[in-house]
Amino acid sequence: MVKKNTFFANKNLGQNFLVDSEVINRIINVINPKSHDFMIEIGPGLGALTYPICKILHKLFVIEHDNNLGTRLLKDISNIEVFVEDVLKFNFLNLINNSFKSVRIIGNLPYNISIPILFYLFKFHNNIIDMNFMFQKEVASKLLAIPGTKSYSRLSIIAQYYCDIDFLFDVVAQSFYPIPKVTSSFVRLVPRKVFNLYVRDINQLSNVTALAFQQRRKIVKNSLSSLFNDDALRKLGIDPLLRAENLSVKQYCLLSNHVC
């Protein structure tokens, strides 16, 4: 197990530190970092992944909101660059453009902001090779959900539009300190280089899905009544009596293009 030292988790930052060496080794194996990889780690915490990865890479970039943790890593590791910043305000393009390479991103994401982080990273999808993240299992289920299931959500649609997504494995709560109340899942997201669905304006896809899932059990003729009448829905091949959770990613793309 990784030593917890004298650091205490900051609940406001959603910190749950990975401390299980078996899980850490498994993550390193599935990420399979190469010495030349341009890699960014979000939320390194106590350095459970940071230390072993830095033994492989020429250099690792990390984004850590907690100044104490960031300073500790900088003191201990020579081939690391630490940005003590809020990841939701971090300009990834500056770093990417300066390196002239596409990036791999890894992290044990803070549970309380994992979804906002993901939506923020989608903005940089053209410059990302893959993202390997630890999520709360409930979030992982939403990422992978198919239409008609309880977990299917706006997150499912946006994430599946942008990425190919693979579930890698679950991680029990006892692998973290402090022990969370939930199981976690390690997931890989690979941004598409060629989109298999056409979306004219991603903002419209975001707006349509947000509107539809405000009340997911409503039929779409009601939840989307401000945008579409029955005839418009039928012309797009969509049954007005279906609920938001029953429409496919492709159908949401059609709806968003019709609004543009």
Swiss-Prot record:
<dbReference type="InterPro" id="IPR020598">
    <property type="entry name" value="rRNA_Ade_methylase_Trfase_N"/>
</dbReference>
<feature type="binding site">
    <location>
        <position position="18"/>
    </location>
    <ligand>
        <name>S-adenosyl-L-methionine</name>
    </ligand>
</feature>
<feature type="binding site">
    <location>
        <position position="86"/>
    </location>
    <ligand>
        <name>S-adenosyl-L-methionine</name>
    </ligand>
</feature>
<keyword id="KW-0698">rRNA processing</keyword>
<dbReference type="InterPro" id="IPR011530">
    <property type="entry name" value="rRNA_adenine_dimethylase"/>
</dbReference>
<dbReference type="Pfam" id="PF00398">
    <property type="entry name" value="RrnaAD"/>
</dbReference>
<protein>
    <recommendedName>
        <fullName>Ribosomal RNA small subunit methyltransferase A</fullName>
        <ecNumber>2.1.1.182</ecNumber>
    </recommendedName>
</protein>
<dbReference type="InterPro" id="IPR029063">
    <property type="entry name" value="SAM-dependent_MTases_sf"/>
</dbReference>
<dbReference type="GO" id="GO:0003723">
    <property type="term" value="F:RNA binding"/>
</dbReference>
<keyword id="KW-0808">Transferase</keyword>
<feature type="binding site">
    <location>
        <position position="108"/>
    </location>
    <ligand>
        <name>S-adenosyl-L-methionine</name>
    </ligand>
</feature>
<comment type="similarity">
    <text>Belongs to the class I-like SAM-binding methyltransferase superfamily. rRNA adenine N(6)-methyltransferase family. RsmA subfamily.</text>
</comment>
<dbReference type="InterPro" id="IPR023165">
    <property type="entry name" value="rRNA_Ade_diMease-like_C"/>
</dbReference>
<keyword id="KW-0963">Cytoplasm</keyword>
<dbReference type="InterPro" id="IPR020596">
    <property type="entry name" value="rRNA_Ade_Mease_Trfase_CS"/>
</dbReference>
<dbReference type="GO" id="GO:0005829">
    <property type="term" value="C:cytosol"/>
</dbReference>
<feature type="binding site">
    <location>
        <position position="43"/>
    </location>
    <ligand>
        <name>S-adenosyl-L-methionine</name>
    </ligand>
</feature>
<dbReference type="GO" id="GO:0052908">
    <property type="term" value="F:16S rRNA (adenine(1518)-N(6)/adenine(1519)-N(6))-dimethyltransferase activity"/>
</dbReference>
<dbReference type="InterPro" id="IPR001737">
    <property type="entry name" value="KsgA/Erm"/>
</dbReference>
<keyword id="KW-0489">Methyltransferase</keyword>
<feature type="binding site">
    <location>
        <position position="16"/>
    </location>
    <ligand>
        <name>S-adenosyl-L-methionine</name>
    </ligand>
</feature>
<comment type="function">
    <text>Specifically dimethylates two adjacent adenosines (A1518 and A1519) in the loop of a conserved hairpin near the 3'-end of 16S rRNA in the 30S particle. May play a critical role in biogenesis of 30S subunits.</text>
</comment>
<keyword id="KW-0694">RNA-binding</keyword>
<keyword id="KW-0949">S-adenosyl-L-methionine</keyword>
<feature type="binding site">
    <location>
        <position position="64"/>
    </location>
    <ligand>
        <name>S-adenosyl-L-methionine</name>
    </ligand>
</feature>
